[in-house]
């Protein structure tokens, strides 16, 4: 089994998380190599087609104006991608490794906490992978037969049918139950899927680490839209979800 072989070869005994925790997350988050064209996708949830009001009149200027968006059905991962999942892809695709990934595709900080091409930071295998450029994230998705979600897809999945600021019923006092942020993270990245999921079954949609989406950044339009993908060109790509 590739997971077991990589674990024995690349992680010293004291670095590996408990077998129970690893197996639980493997089942929950779908630590797999290729979803292909299966009808059921381990570690993913199906988001039904729908229409929602995207943005927030109470948020930052970049979140305005609120506008109506329609989105087709799509699948999205339940969990943020871990160092361990990323390692599996690096083992098969040297192009994405720290020493070989072209400099033009990142800012110089790519996988800066990894000790080597196939050695993540100590005790980080079940934590979300960080210091990943948009291009690296897109290549990773392509290698395993997936793609980056659009910003609209991310938001409808995060909202879970809600219309308020958070993806759950209740105010900011409930936020520590759903995510890691400045006040409760201890200034550290945490193992994925340790908090309560949203109604769609997605974990860490609030905090822990930022998540890349497909779109170039642009100001929102008042116009209604269907399956928006953002502008064709831009200066910055969009991240969603927040971090600590």
Residue ranges and their predicted role:
Residues 3, 12, 51, 56, ...:
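Active-site microenvironments of metalloenzymes and redox enzymes
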Residues 12-15, 19-21, 26, 128, ...:
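Disulfide-stabilized, aromatic/cysteine-rich ligand-recognition loop
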Residues 43-53:
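Mature N-terminal segment immediately following signal peptide/propeptide cleavage
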Residues 46, 130-131, 147-149, 165, ...:
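Structural recognition of the beta-strand scaffold that forms the well-ordered cores
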Residues 54-73, 189-195:
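Short, polar loop/linker segments at the starts of domains and inter-domain junctions
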Residues 123-126, 179-206, 230-233:
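Short, well-ordered junction/capping motifs at the entry into regular secondary structure
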């Amino acid at each position: 089994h590739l997971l077991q072989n990589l674990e024995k070869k690349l992680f010293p005994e004291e670095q590996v998380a408990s077998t129970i925790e690893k197996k639980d997350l493997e089942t929950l988050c779908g630590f797999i190599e290729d979803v292909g064209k299966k009808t059921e996708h381990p570690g993913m949830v199906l988001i039904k087609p729908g229409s929602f009001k995207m943005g927030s009149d109470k948020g930052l200027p970049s979140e305005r104006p609120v506008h109506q968006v329609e989105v087709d059905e799509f699948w999205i991962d339940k969990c943020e991608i871990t160092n361990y999942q990323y390692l599996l892809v690096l083992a098969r695709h040297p192009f994405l490794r720290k020493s070989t990934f072209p400099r033009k595709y990142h800012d110089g900080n790519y996988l800066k906490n990894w000790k080597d091409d196939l050695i993540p930071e100590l005790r980080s295998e079940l934590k979300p992978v960080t210091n990943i450029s948009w291009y690296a994230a897109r290549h990773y998705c392509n290698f395993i037969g997936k793609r980056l979600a659009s910003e609209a897809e991310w938001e409808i999945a995060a909202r879970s049918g809600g219309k308020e600021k958070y993806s759950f019923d209740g105010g900011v006092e409930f936020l520590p139950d759903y995510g890691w942020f400045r006040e409760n993270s201890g200034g550290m990245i945490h193992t994925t899927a340790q908090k309560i999921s949203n109604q769609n079954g997605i974990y860490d949609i609030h905090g822990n680490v930022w998540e890349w989406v497909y779109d170039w950044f642009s100001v929102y339009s008042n116009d209604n839209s269907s399956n928006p993908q953002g502008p064709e060109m831009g200066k910055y790509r969009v991240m969603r979800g927040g971090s600590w």
